[in-house]
């Protein structure tokens, strides 16, 4: 493991001299997906306080934030060090509009489809989240309006939605529509019975049906990867993995399983590389190597190498920087959006959500990503709605969709017991692990 250390720079925070608290509103036992966090047999629901102070960490992410407004700054302690890979520079990239922060919503909007009818069903169902911000049972009246609007829109646009299904997925798509209709009726019964606590779980369920409908509109893989990367492991679609982490020195929680959805539609090379490494069990038994309140990071193997050594070449396998921009049909490779002069471009899968997953790389080598990955721990106050410091500079390729809040509990030295692909492995093309096996 690399041993050179470098100082981290000063960073800035908007509207706060401390990081705000982030509430966790669910138990970490998640039976429908068998995704859980546990402390023996005790179900654990917690409230996370302010982030921990920065500490020595495994690889360098220089979090210098150039924001668009005047803000107070917080200097890092003098002994905060990191090895020289990778670094996040201090140039911000503009995005427009208020950010969507829910990881599953981001994944739905990132699908390569163009069907206005299903998007108009999706929106009022997502708006239930805002309705639940109303105090008490009064929120239920707003929830009812959301659901009735979605139901009407579904009936009005059903023929357009059905016509949008890929031929091979029509049966499954129609099944998802039936489940969505039944789910919305269940939600109206919940509202009628004034069971506020049952709304959010049912919303999550019916939005999964919406996501299923939208995925059934994708007909194959929508573009060709550039020839120079075509023989690399490629994720041509999506895959889900479960990452089980053994948490040390925490009396409240012993282990946690994080569900991660990997988006190969928008980052096929990056996501394919990761799935291939997962199937090689590369990360099994590896420690968390950085956890400082901004990122959780791992992937630096033991020894002098800073990435995955391909046994067929005995060299580090690297992947290019891969950024999909809204309105483009294929990703940009090898250059940051800043280098391309696309300062106001919006990326399809942004660093908006707590638990955004991205590929780490060296500061001045865009195509140096290999096996080191990080998850962003970020409250919305860290960046104003029209400024994002990481989009277009690092390749996002997935989001933690279950138990993401518990990423903040991970510490250096906690152990990844295993990462397993639970769906979508059939979307991996050119898997090198099979050749190695």
From Swiss-Prot:
Keywords assigned: Chloroplast, Isomerase, Plastid, Rotamase, Thylakoid, Transit peptide
Transit peptide segment: 1-36, 37-92
Pfam family, one: Pro_isomerase
Protein's UniProt keywords contain Thylakoid: yes
Localization annotation: Plastid, Chloroplast thylakoid lumen
Boundaries of every PPIase cyclophilin-type domain copy: 245-437
GO BP of this protein: lateral root morphogenesis; photosystem II assembly; photosystem II stabilization
Induction conditions: Up-regulated by light. Down-regulated by dark.
PROSITE patterns associated with the record: CSA_PPIASE_2 (PS50072)
Consequence of gene disruption: Stunted growth and hypersensitivity to high light.
Domain comment, as recorded: The N-terminal helical domain blocks the interaction with the potential target PSII subunit chlorophyll protein 47 (CP47).
Role of this protein: Required for the assembly and stabilization of PSII, but has no PPIases activity.
CDD domains listed in its UniProt record: cyclophilin_TLP40_like
Tissue and organ distribution: Ubiquitous. Lower levels of expression in roots.
Catalytic activity: [protein]-peptidylproline (omega=180) = [protein]-peptidylproline (omega=0)
Protein's UniProt keywords contain Transit peptide: yes
Protein's name in the database: Peptidyl-prolyl cis-trans isomerase CYP38, chloroplastic
Domain of life the protein comes from: Eukaryota
PANTHER family, alphabetized: PEPTIDYL-PROLYL CIS-TRANS ISOMERASE CYP38, CHLOROPLASTIC
GO MF term set: peptidyl-prolyl cis-trans isomerase activity
EC number(s) stated in the UniProt entry for this protein: 5.2.1.8
A Gene Ontology cellular-component term: chloroplast thylakoid lumen
Organism expressing this protein natively: Arabidopsis thaliana
């Amino acid at each position: 493991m690399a041993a050179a250390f470098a100082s981290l720079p000063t960073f800035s925070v908007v509207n706060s001299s401390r990081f705000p608290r982030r509430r966790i509103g669910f138990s970490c036992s998640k039976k429908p997906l068998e995704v859980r966090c546990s402390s023996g047999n005790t179900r654990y629901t917690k409230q996370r306080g302010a982030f921990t102070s920065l500490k020595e960490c495994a690889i360098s992410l220089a979090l210098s934030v150039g924001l668009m407004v005047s803000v107070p700054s917080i200097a890092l302690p003098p002994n905060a060090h990191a090895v020289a890979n990778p670094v996040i520079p201090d140039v911000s990239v503009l995005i427009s509009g208020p950010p969507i922060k829910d990881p599953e919503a981001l994944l739905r909007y990132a699908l390569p489809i163009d069907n206005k009818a299903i998007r108009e069903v999706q929106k009022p169902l997502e708006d239930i989240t805002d309705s639940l911000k109303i105090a008490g049972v009064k929120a239920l009246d707003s929830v009812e309006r959301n659901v009735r609007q979605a139901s009407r829109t579904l009936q009005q646009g059903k023929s357009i939605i059905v016509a949008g299904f890929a031929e091979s997925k029509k049966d499954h798509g129609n099944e998802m529509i039936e489940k969505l209709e039944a789910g919305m009726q269940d939600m109206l019964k919940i509202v009628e019975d004034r069971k506020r606590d049952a709304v959010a779980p049912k919303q999550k369920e019916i939005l999964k049906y919406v996501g299923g409908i939208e995925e059934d509109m994708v007909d194959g893989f929508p573009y060709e990867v550039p020839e120079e990367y075509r023989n690399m492991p490629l994720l041509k679609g999506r895959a889900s993995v479960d990452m089980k982490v053994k948490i040390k020195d925490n009396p409240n929680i012993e282990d946690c399983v994080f569900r991660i959805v990997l988006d190969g539609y928008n980052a096929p090379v990056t996501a394919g590389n990761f799935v291939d490494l997962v199937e090689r069990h590369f990360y099994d038994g590896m420690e968390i190597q950085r956890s400082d309140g901004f990122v959780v990071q791992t992937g630096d193997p033991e020894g002098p190498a800073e990435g995955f050594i391909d046994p067929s070449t005995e060299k580090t396998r690297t992947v290019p920087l891969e950024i999909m921009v809204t309105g483009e049909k294929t990703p940009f490779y090898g250059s940051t959006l800043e280098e391309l002069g696309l300062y106001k471009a919006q990326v399809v899968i942004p660093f908006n959500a707590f638990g955004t997953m991205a590929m780490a790389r060296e500061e001045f080598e865009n195509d140096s990503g290999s096996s080191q990955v990080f998850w962003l721990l970020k409250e919305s106050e860290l960046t104003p709605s029209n400024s994002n410091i990481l989009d277009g500079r690092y390749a996002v390729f997935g989001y933690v969709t279950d138990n993401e809040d518990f990423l903040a509990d991970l510490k250096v030295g906690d152990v990844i017991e295993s990462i397993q692909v639970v769906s979508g492995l059939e979307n991996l093309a050119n898997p090198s692990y099979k050749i190695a096996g």
